[in-house]
Amino acid sequence: MKRKEGKLKGYKGLNLYYQYWLPEGKPKAVLLVAHGLAEHSGRYKNLVDYFVPKGYAVYALDHRGHGKSEGTRSYVDNFNDYLTDLETFFGMVRKENKNARIFLFGHSLGGTIATAYAVEHQEGLAGLILSGSSLVPSTSVSPALLAMAGVVSALLPKMGVTLLDASAISRDKAVVDAYVNDPLVFRGKVPARTGAELARMWKHLPEQMHKIKLPILIMHGFADQLANPAGSKLLYERVSSKDKTLKLYDNCYHEICNEPEREQVFMDMQAWLAKHI
């Protein structure tokens, strides 16, 4: 396995960090990873260690305001900025892998980004894989908090409004401890503008889901308290894809790739990918 890293210019000239892992020989396909809110590309070691030895290349970008990329921590001025950055990153990955089949993998916020991206940019993608996507309001997010985020976003967009509950990411204590102690994970309050932009996507994305015609694998932990599983069910119902699969994992928390059942999750992903390459 070979690991490389680099930087690219994102929207408005922001320096964005990325890293990628290559198998020995020509890749079977490419997994392009869009990570979740407040985390970074380096937290996908389990996925990398499973898929790269099996012949897949994995490319992962740190979103603006995340990990080793520039920008105010966990802040986005407009959700479309994420999509523009991803389009730039996809172009780079495509250039380096001209004939490869590229699958977009999105987790949590990255699932929101991947879904929104697929609505407008299906060309060049072989398929979409989603994990714990944030597509509708979480049951832990009150209407009052959503309303407050919208008001504060207009006045003080970078003001922190809510903390993410680290204990809700996984039932594996080692995963939670590593998350809490990771210097590249943002442990402060999520900025109001970011919350408001995510809420905007929750409102408008359901109206656009029917535009997706790609092969799609939708996965979600049934006990996820950070991203509502109802969003994944809604996406499954509304996409126009004839080739669509929904996998719900009993007892699993938000990060199904970091849960005790992760081996089964990866086996399900691998079986799905094998049918699409």
Tell what function each PLM region has.
Residues 1-25:
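N-terminal cap/lid segment of alpha/beta-hydrolase-fold proteins
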Residues 28-36:
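Short beta-strand element of the alpha/beta-hydrolase
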Residues 38-41, 67-101:
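Catalytic nucleophile-loop/oxyanion-hole region of alpha/beta-hydrolase
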Residues 43, 48-71:
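Conserved alpha/beta-hydrolase
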Residues 107-190:
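Alpha/beta-hydrolase-fold enzymes
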Residues 212, 218-220, 224:
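Short beta-strand/loop motif that positions the catalytic acidic residue
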Residues 214, 228-237:
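Short alpha-helix in the alpha/beta-hydrolase fold that links the catalytic acid
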Residues 245-277:
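Catalytic active-site module of serine/aspartate enzymes centered on a nucleophile-bearing elbow/loop
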